[in-house]
Amino acid sequence: MLKIQNLKKSYGKRTILNNVNMNIPKGKVYALIGPNGAGKSTIMKILTGLVSKTSGSIIFEGREWSRRDLRKIGSIIEEPPLYKNLSAYDNMKVVTTMLGVSESTILPLLNKVGLGNIDKRPVKQFSLGMKQRLGIAISLINSPKLLILDEPTNGLDPIGIQELREIIESFKSEGMTIMISSHILSEVEHLADFIGFIYEGKIILEKEYDGSENLEELFNNQILFEKRR
């Protein structure tokens, strides 16, 4: 589905990403894990066209990634850009109209994220968790091949975190390809099929994950190994 080879990103003399290599298989959940400032968001911003790469190769569906592929990628990188005085439905309608997608897709997508039965109240009255779920519904309007979620549970209360986990689990059961980032290992250990540990701008470990290993222990051991190299 997606292969990243020798990806670099620098700002002047400051290197943010240093020869990053990743392989995200189709139909799997790939968890990008690392501390704040490790480079997780930079990778996701490059993949969604928000930031340009310095060098390296990105292969998407068997060919070199280009900006035309952005229509095939749904994403929540920062707080969703919502119209706060409009309802969830009307927010969706704005985007379907802009993209030329049938309005009939709106309610099924709202149901998919647990927002199909809410009233017409404006988004400004929503909790952060509801805004995140609406953002995800909007990101699915174009039927993307890849869904990218950058620390989607950040700032949510326990109820919001659980609701979002259940939604991602339902996407996983449908075979959707998802890339999710987090610095909290417990948030992804039940979701991930593959893990990539990023530390100081480098992928220090990438492997298939079946849930049998303790992620925190695995990550800490890998960091110790890197520091000793």
Curated annotation (Swiss-Prot):
Show where the ABC transporter domain sits.
Answer: 2-225
Which residues are listed for ATP binding in this entry? 34-41
Lineage, top-rank taxon, reads Bacteria
Does Transferase appear among the keywords?
A: no
Under the heading Pfam families, the entry gives: ABC_tran (PF00005)
Q: Enumerate the InterPro entries for this protein.
A: AAA+_ATPase (IPR003593), ABC_Gallidermin_ATP-bd (IPR022501), ABC_transporter-like_ATP-bd (IPR003439), ABC_transporter-like_CS (IPR017871), P-loop_NTPase (IPR027417)
What keywords are assigned to this protein?
Answer: ATP-binding, Bacteriocin transport, Nucleotide-binding, Protein transport, Transport
- Which GO MF terms are attached to this record? ATP binding; ATP hydrolysis activity
One example of a Gene Ontology biological process annotation: protein transport
Q: What is its biological role?
A: Implicated in the export process of the lantibiotic SrtA.
Fetch the NCBIfam families from UniProt. galliderm_ABC (TIGR03740)
Q: Which family does it belong to?
A: Belongs to the ABC transporter superfamily.
Name of the protein: Lantibiotic transport ATP-binding protein SrtF
Please tell me the species this chain comes from: Streptococcus pyogenes serotype M1
Name of encoding gene: srtF
